[in-house]
């Protein structure tokens, strides 16, 4: 009784693939602070005098994987309610929540520039990807129409398509990823509407470039460039100017309904940050918490090898 009649590779360890997302989500939701939203904040460390912010502006990333174009606009609308139109200082992105490794352990380098493998950062804008839509012309042989979302001057587009022209070659989306460039190349024969997501290098710079671009669009005079630095929270002058919150439920829905790799990694990073209370969190900090839950459930963590939060690892 209770004995197997036949086994085949019963002891073989298999890749979890996207079922890994279940372990990550369950562990994250088991924590007391599980319902804390994913936050993106803007702070300054100076004073506002005569229409000028005398000090630095900081955008503090909380690894919100659902921060999109609308979120960016809403954050900026809050910032411009403050009585200044000139920033006499620097604009910084604070990505100190996480270490600098932008891919998970065992992720395939040649999966880039696929949208399902973005460059991970506490500052994510539109999932670190651009959605490209290609529509054939009404005239055979004409160049197809290409549109991209979100709009940003951070990337460029090269359109080498032909409408319903077989000798134009196989249709393809790509990016000059071998040189970490952000020129999106769309080429080949377009016989019908095509859509795809392409990742952008690199995510925090994509975020900050677009943030400055849209601030200027609202009439704010900003520095020409941005940098990366940690918010000096112990300074008496620091003040929060704006905050965007994304609910855990929204992040979870995208994770479980759409099997979103980015959302799983965001949960893993936040899990590590909540458990350790430290900065520069590594994936291993979150994985340790998953292993602890496995033990609490009566299993031996030594029977499992966990490499990331989403199951993309090879």
Show the residue positions of the predicted features.
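Short active-site loop at a secondary-structure junction
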Residues: 7-27, 31
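Conserved serine DD-peptidase/penicillin-binding transpeptidase domain
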Residues: 31-302
